[in-house]
Amino acid sequence: MLDPNLLRNEPDAVAEKLARRGFKLDVDKLRALEERRKVLQVNTENLQAERNSRSKSIGQAKARGEDIEPLRLEVNKLGEELDAAKAELETLLAEIRDIALTIPNLPADEVPVGKDENDNVEVSRWGTPREFDFEIRDHVTLGEMHSGLDFAAAVKLTGSRFVVMKGQIARMHRALSQFMLDLHTEQHGYSENYVPYLVNHDTLYGTGQLPKFAGDLFHTRPLEEEADSSNYALIPTAEVPLTNLVRDEIIDEDQLPIKMTAHTPCFRSEAGSYGRDTRGLIRMHQFDKVEMVQIVRPEDSMAALEEMTGHAEKVLQLLGLPYRKIILCTGDMGFGACKTYDLEVWVPAQNTYREISSCSNVWDFQARRMQARCRSKSDKKTRLVHTLNGSGLAVGRTLVAVMENYQQADGRIEVPEVLRPYMNGLEYIG
């Protein structure tokens, strides 16, 4: 959520920055609501002061032995008017808040202006895509050769965009997540967390999934509605529970940065992606990811973004997977991000790079929703923290990249050296 004072006092400047990311802010409506808020605020305060004054008069009149009934009736009437004014003000404030919850974050000045993914800017490349002297098999073909990917079984169990992994392919999938966690915790300074896969609506509001992206989530619903039944949703990313661990907290600044990681399944409805990536593991309703989250001082967040992106890059480098780093343009950034780097790994069967990690600085956008603050050691004043999140990495897509980049002419899959300790020294699948 943007700073309400910024929306209130500098709506034109905010609108100009939001226009860079293709969002039209209704400045006239905001101004009208703000003028109405001021009127209602003054009216409410005046009624409160008048009621307090009249209430004191009752005691004074009673002490003088005067008839207090007219004053009592007047105070009661003022009370009714005050309650009505407060209710009207609360309704207006709720309307303003609802609008604020739909406004995306402001882009950082250095983010390239653009409409969509076609306007993203490549920053760098690492590694050289392998040249094959045989016909490339895609990961689906390789997985079926080794009885490791069973999409038909998943359709029977659940439906499309799910998979059953088996044997050494399932083992490599597990090895990848363990390798990523060990790297981030042992070398990059993150603490490992195990978090719930179901979260409540307050948690989803905190990180910005609600109210705007309710349709992208899988929501729980009792077979028979009960008055006390809780509303939960499956997490779309571990960013949601990890970041919300600091919700409503005041953290001493000398405790920052807080760096957390978790390996979880992620659940997404993939609304709007009909017909895209229907074959294989690239776009699933359920997929595993190792997530990185940092909670930092505001002045440290841009440096933290560079560091976090480097941590994700290290995973790819140790796996020997060619990739490119791009900075997303204003029109392609996520709702809460002010700046985002994507890492795209080389997928031989598609002869292109595909997203495997997204690392974002969110500034104080989530912290304001969560009321997550830090306290200065010198003057004890509090301020909102900055939050960052990044994939380190998407496990299923990493599996795709390993299977395809390490395939052999006979269909075997070489196991990258860094994964062999997690697979009992196995060198090849098949």
Swiss-Prot record:
Highest taxon in the source lineage: Bacteria
InterPro entries named in the record: aa-tRNA-synt_IIb (IPR002314), aa-tRNA-synth_II (IPR006195), aa-tRNA-synth_II/BPL/LPL (IPR045864), Ser-tRNA-ligase_type_1 (IPR002317), Ser-tRNA-synth_1_N (IPR015866), SerRS_1_N_sf (IPR042103), SerRS_core (IPR033729), tRNA-bd_arm (IPR010978)
SUPFAM superfamilies, sorted: Class II aaRS and biotin synthetases, tRNA-binding arm
Subcellular location: Cytoplasm
Sites where the protein binds L-serine: T237, A238, E239, E291, S391
One GO biological process term: seryl-tRNA aminoacylation
Entry binding sites for ATP: R268, S269, E270, E355, I356, S357, S358
Enzyme class: ligase
Catalytic reaction list: tRNA(Ser) + L-serine + ATP = L-seryl-tRNA(Ser) + AMP + diphosphate + H(+); tRNA(Sec) + L-serine + ATP = L-seryl-tRNA(Sec) + AMP + diphosphate + H(+)
Signal peptide bounds: none
GO molecular function: ATP binding; serine-tRNA ligase activity
Pathway connected to this protein: Aminoacyl-tRNA biosynthesis; selenocysteinyl-tRNA(Sec) biosynthesis; L-seryl-tRNA(Sec) from L-serine and tRNA(Sec): step 1/1
GO cellular component, one term: cytoplasm
Record-linked CDD domains: SerRS_core (cd00770)
Keywords: Aminoacyl-tRNA synthetase, ATP-binding, Cytoplasm, Ligase, Nucleotide-binding, Protein biosynthesis
PROSITE patterns associated with the record: AA_TRNA_LIGASE_II
EC number: 6.1.1.11
Self-association state and partner proteins as the record states: Homodimer. The tRNA molecule binds across the dimer.
Domain commentary: Consists of two distinct domains, a catalytic core and a N-terminal extension that is involved in tRNA binding.
Chain's role: Catalyzes the attachment of serine to tRNA(Ser). Is also able to aminoacylate tRNA(Sec) with serine, to form the misacylated tRNA L-seryl-tRNA(Sec), which will be further converted into selenocysteinyl-tRNA(Sec).
UniProt record similarity statement: Belongs to the class-II aminoacyl-tRNA synthetase family. Type-1 seryl-tRNA synthetase subfamily.
HAMAP family: Ser_tRNA_synth_type1
Protein name, entry field: Serine--tRNA ligase
Species for this entry: Salmonella heidelberg (strain SL476)
This protein's encoding gene: serS
